[in-house]
Structure formats: C-alpha cells, structure tokens
UniProtKB/Swiss-Prot annotation:
Record-linked Gene3D superfamilies: Metal-dependent hydrolases, Urease, subunit C, domain 1
Transmembrane segments: none
Cofactor(s) this protein requires: Mn(2+)
Species in which this protein is naturally found: Escherichia coli O9:H4 (strain HS)
Molecular function terms, GO-annotated: adenine deaminase activity
Cited InterPro entries: Adenine_deam, Adenine_deam_C, Amidohydro-rel, Metal-dep_hydrolase_composite, Metal_Hydrolase
Organism phylogeny: Bacteria, Pseudomonadati, Pseudomonadota, Gammaproteobacteria, Enterobacterales
Catalytic activity line of the entry: adenine + H2O + H(+) = hypoxanthine + NH4(+)
Alphabetical UniProt keywords: Hydrolase, Manganese
Matches recorded under NCBIfam families: ade, PRK10027.1
Name of this protein: Adenine deaminase
Length: 588
C-alpha cells in the first residue's frame, strides 16, 4: 500500500505544526503533561521513563528531558505504564447489536481508540443509506472510527436475497471520504481467482488504499492467485499452518477472537519479533455481553500475555502499531513526537488494567460519554423503520417430508467456529440415525414472498424449543432453529412482530426476546441494558440444551455461503467448497 495514504488522514495545519514545534523545543506551554509514567517501547522493547507532553491532538515530546516542561494541566499517572490506544483491525459494529455511538461508549473507556469497520451488515439490509449513517457517526465520534467500503453486497451474487445493492458507482462516491481507509473484505474469492472483471474493477478502484481479504482455508495456487490480485490481509485463518503460509506469501494476518469465531489460541503461537509488524488483532463480531464482562481488544491482549507468553511490547505492538502501519494511519499506533495523542494508561500492563484513556489529546470520561449518548445518537439521524417485509408464518411452512431409508444432508456445527462440516444421516420410521438433528430454516424478509428454505442441523445442541433471529450473515434474513415446527413458527412470528430481533421459545411460549429496531440488527438501548438483555436471552437459550457459548452469533453464520462447508440461504442448501447449491437428499 502507498504510504502517501497517510496524507488523507493526518490533517494538521501549518499553524498547528508551529505550535507543536514550539512545545517540542520547550519554547511554549503544553496543554497536558503526563507525569510519573513509564512508556512501553513497542519498537525496541523495554520502557522509556519520563513525561509525555501534549499540544492539541498531538504528542509534542516524550522522555526525561520534559520533566520540567510547562503545561496548563498535569496528569499524575501514579506509576502507570503508557501504551498506544488499541486498534481493532476488522469488525462489524452491527454485530455488537449496538449503534456506533453506543459502541464507542462501551469500548473507548477500555482503551479501544480506533476501529476499522466494515458496515456491510447494515448495507446488505438498506444499501447506501446504511453506509451513510455509519459515516455520519464516524464524523462525530471521539473514537477514531474508520470505514472500509463494503465490497460484496450481497456476499455472493445469486446465492441469497438481500435488501439492497451497493454498486461500484455508489462505492466510488465514498472512496475519498476522510474516514474511509479502503475496500472491505473481498469475500468472493473464487470470483477474484477466476479474474471476474466486475470484482477486479472494485479492486482497481481502491488499489491506492487498503484491500481487505477473506479466504478461510485457502492454500496452494488459489491462495497465490488471490494475493496476486492485490489482496493484503485475511481475518479468516483458523489453522496455524494456514496463517503461517499467508504470512510467508506476504499477507498480513489478522488474528481474530470474536464471540463465535475464536482463532486466537490456534494462531497466537505464530507471533514473534520478526513477523509481529505483519500481525494484527481483530474481533470481527463480538457481542455486548462479552464486551461488558470480558472486554474487547484489551481482552485479546491479556490472553496473549497470560496464556501465550507473548512479550509485552509485542502484544501491544500487534494491538496498535502494526495495524496503524497496515492501514496507512501513520499518525497512530506509537507514543512518539508528532503522533496523535491516543494514550492508554495501565495500572497493570500484564493484566491490561486500564486506568485512564486519552484520545486526540483529551482525557475520556466514561460518565460523560454515557450522559451524552442519547443526544449524539439523535444527532446522527439513525435510519429507523421496519425492514421486515414478511407476513406471519404457520407450522405448516416448516413441514418437511422424509422417506425411510433415504440419506439426507446435515449441516454440522463446530462450536466456536464459523466453518461447518457437511455430513449426512439416514431417516427411518423412528427418525434419523443420530439424535442431535434439529431443523433449520431461512426465510427471506424483503418482500419476495419465497417459501422458507429448510434443512437439517447437527451438533448445535438444541434438545428442545426454538431460536430465531434477523441477524443472519450477510443478507440478514430470518434464521430459525428448532425441534418442532410449531415452536419455530412462534419464534419467527415474534421477531416479525418486533420488527427484527432475537427470540427464544420453549414449552410453547416465548421465553425471551430482544427487539432490534435499526435494520433488524441494532438496538438503541444502552450498552449496560443490552448486555443484561443478552444475558437473559442466553440464560433462556441454555434451557434448550448444551448450545454453543454464543448461540445467536453461531446461528447467524449458518447462512453465510462464503464460509465452508455447508450452509443454508434463503435459496436453499449451499456447498461452500464447490460454491454451488445442493439438495437436501443425498442422491449420489
């Protein structure tokens, strides 16, 4: 990527430079001086002793030579360790079910000062209007909220019904927006490898920025071809050797630890002094309960240090500087002169205990963020409105006919992974030859009046009841899993009535439900309220059987055709390895 991209983001006037230089020389008064602090050296390792002086949004100087520097305000760090603000290299804020405003309130006090966001969830539902709203939120945010322009809406052409398109012409209209860092994950990797001109046109249009990848399990000549097209990174790696090979071929590796896809344990052993500038941390999809109880990028850093013995400076490097360099955000990622003053003060660097956060040179107050949240959300003009164009359903809509002696395909879930296996099961008069088979259905919600696409699901752990949601990647149709058609219908009708959301049904009754009024994806509740509601949903879901740790996030990926092996879209069963539809009955 061309380093000149930094000029797009690093806006500083000549007057600001002169003021900054004057403070650096010791000829002018700083705005803030952070004293009694040690600075973690991400380049050499070890620590730098001495103050940090700040003028405006930027660091003017670091080190003992500024011990007596004049400043308008002094911050006593009380022996804390200072590190750069954390950066999430790839996420979909919508998957937190929070608005970008609420997400900032929940994560900025945890040290997450920068996010690289792909808003393709809301773009799949409402098109350019969704992207425009995210841009408005980013413009007013204290947090550095950067956007990658969604590249695959829908995820795979012709495989699902979604709510809107996002054409190249529309994408280009956002390319020069000050918050746009590049092109979001190019999920149609077979199309890129085969040289489809429509996809190459998108890559060419954003080649001077950053080109995000998406290629789970890809190897050999296909991986070489994908990288040849200009793809620069991947967040979908889930095996050690897969990650190593991508690094060898020049890709940057995003190590993901989300609520469903948990790849940190598999990939953390790769990180070392040599390759850490090419390694980054990301969450992709993380729900509000985990953010509240475990953390965000801070939780990933903690695990690298405590569970994988990654040296402190390397762990914090991959959480900040590596990502800033990759995206051309050269004003971020280091505590050094001329860099933006995004600073996290840690009372315990090994446990990632956040004491105080500064962003753009100003201390962050969590209570102020909470108090201003409602007004700032209203200022962003959220795109309210019911996006569920689906009539209520009945149990007969989920009726499947099976023939004794026949074999049927089953989507087999792998807990805490996005990939699935494709297995089969024989049906007899007593049912299937395995007792963990549930029913799954996907119902398009955009007014096409299609019959539900139905299939079989194994390994999910559902012993009774039903779960339904409008969070269903990436087209966000209605997905429902159940043991009976009656309870599946009840769950679906509840989310239709709510205008989108999540629902748990058991014993013929709705046990818990969460309305998501923005695009059927996001709530307008506070982060704390949302976490409590998620807690109630998870508790209700656990009564239905030994489900995955995050059942709704795991369920949401069962309809995403660009991740192998077997998925179900509104169009039917899809073989994610052959990239073709297949039948429920095994006929070969």
């Amino acid at each position: 990527m061309n380093n000149s991209i930094n000029h797009k983001f690093h806006h500083i006037s000549r007057a600001e430079y002169q003021e900054l230089l004057a403070v650096s020389r010791g000829d002018a008064v700083a705005d803030y001086l952070i004293d009694n602090v040690s600075i973690l050296d991400l380049i050499n390792g070890g620590e730098i002793s001495g103050p940090i002086v700040i003028k405006g949004r930027y660091i003017a100087g670091v080190g003992a030579e500024y011990a007596d520097a004049p400043a308008l305000q002094r911050i006593d760090a009380r022996g804390a360790t200072a590190v750069p603000g954390f950066i999430d290299a790839h996420l979909h804020i919508e998957s937190s079910m929070m608005t970008p405003v609420t997400f900032e309130t929940a994560t900025l006090p945890r040290g997450l000062t920068t996010v690289i966001c792909d808003p393709h969830e809301i773009v799949n539902v409402m098109g350019e209007a969704g992207f425009a709203w995210f841009a408005r939120c980013a413009e007013q945010a204290r947090q550095n909220q950067y956007l990658q322009v969604s590249s695959c809406v829908p995820a795979l052409e012709g495989c699902d019904v979604n709510g809107a398109s996002f054409t190249l012409e529309q994408m280009l209209a956002w390319r020069d927006h000050p918050q746009v860092t590049g092109l979001a994950e190019m999920m149609d990797y077979p199309g890129v490898i085969s040289g489809q001109n429509a996809l190459l046109d998108k890559l060419d249009a954003f080649r001077h920025l950053t080109l995000d990848g998406h290629c789970p399990g890809l190897g050999g000549k296909e991986l070489n071809a994908y990288i040849t097209a200009g793809i620069e990174n991947c967040h979908e790696s889930y095996q050690l050797e897969e990650g190593r090979r991508k690094l060898q071929l020049g890709m940057s590796l995003m190590i993901r630890e989300g609520s469903a896809a948990r790849n940190l344990n598999a990939l953390a052993p790769l990180i070392n002094e040599f390759n850490s500038p090419q390694c980054m941390l990301c969450t992709d999809d993380r729900n509000p309960w985990e953010i509240a109880h475990e953390g965000h990028i801070d939780a990933l850093i903690r695990r690298l240090i405590e569970q994988h013995n990654v040296p402190l400076h390397v762990a914090y490097r991959v959480a900040s500087w590596s990502t800033a360099r990759h995206f051309g955000l050269n004003h971020l990622g280091l505590l050094a002169p001329g860099k933006q003053a995004d600073i996290v003060l840690l009372s315990d660097a090994r446990k990632v205990t956040v004491q105080q956060v500064l962003v753009k040179g100003e201390p962050i107050d969590a209570q102020t963020l909470q108090a201003e949240e409602s007004a700032r959300l209203a200022q962003s003009a959220p795109p309210y409105g019911n996006t569920i164009a689906r009539q209520p359903v009945s149990a007969s809509d989920f009726a499947l006919q099976f023939t004794p002696g026949k074999r049927y395909r089953v989507i087999d879930v792998i807990h805490n992974e996005l990939i699935t296996h494709s297995h089969s099961s024989v049906y007899s008069e007593n049912g299937f030859d395995r007792d963990d088979v549930s029913f799954i259905a996907v119902l398009e919600r955009y007014g096409q009046r299609l019959a539900p696409a139905c299939g079989l699901l194994g390994g999910f752990g559902l012993n009774e009841g039903a779960l339904a949601a409008t969070v269903s990647h990436d087209s966000h149709n209605i997905v429902v899993i159940g043991r009976s058609a009656e309870e599946m219908a009840l769950a679906v009708n509840q989310v239709i009535q709510d205008g989108g959301g999540l629902c748990v049904v058991r014993n013929g009754q709705v046990q818990s439900h969460l309305p998501l009024p923005i695009a059927g994806l996001m709530s307008t509740d506070t982060a704390q309220s949302l976490a409590e509601q998620i807690d109630a949903l998870k508790a209700a879901a656990r009564e239905c059987g030994p489900l995955p740790d995050e059942p709704f996030i795991q369920m949401a990926f069962l309809s995403l055709p660009v991740i192998p092996a077997l998925k179900l879209t509104s169009q039917g069963l899809f073989d994610g390895e052959k990239f073709a539809f297949t039948t429920l009955e095994v006929t070969e």
